[in-house]
Design a protein with these regions (language model features):
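Short acidic-glycine-tyrosine-enriched beta hairpin
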Residues: 48-65
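Short loop/turn motifs at secondary-structure junctions and domain boundaries
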Residues: 24-26
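Ligand-binding loop in jelly-roll beta-barrel domains
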Residues: 64-88
Length: 96
């Protein structure tokens, strides 16, 4: 079983950094897996413009170098895992 090489802290709607609320991207070769532990966030990709609803039952894969940002929908807790290969969201959260 593959594992992430790093994970962000767990953020809530108050502690989510501006860097994640605005356009940003993962580095070359890094996949992100956005896991919502409680509540809901919107994940917006800007190239092309698409929006995904991310919930505890529906994590989201973020491809390498895909420009995106997140928008909390009310109270939430979320974490991002960083992978060297495409993650399998069904493997369950590492932290949380």
């Amino acid at each position: 079983m593959s594992e992430p090489y790093a994970s962000s802290p767990i953020f809530d709607e108050q502690t989510l950094p501006d860097a994640l609320r605005n356009d940003h991207r993962t580095k070359t070769g890094t996949w992100g897996l956005l896991r919502v532990l409680e509540g809901e966030v919107r994940l917006i990709f800007t190239e092309p413009l698409t929006e995904h609803r991310v919930t505890p039952d529906s994590p989201a894969i973020i491809p390498p170098q895909a420009t995106h940002y997140v928008v909390p929908v009310g109270a939430m807790r979320m974490q991002v895992e960083f992978w060297r290969e495409r993650p399998d969201p069904s493997e369950g959260p590492i932290n949380g």
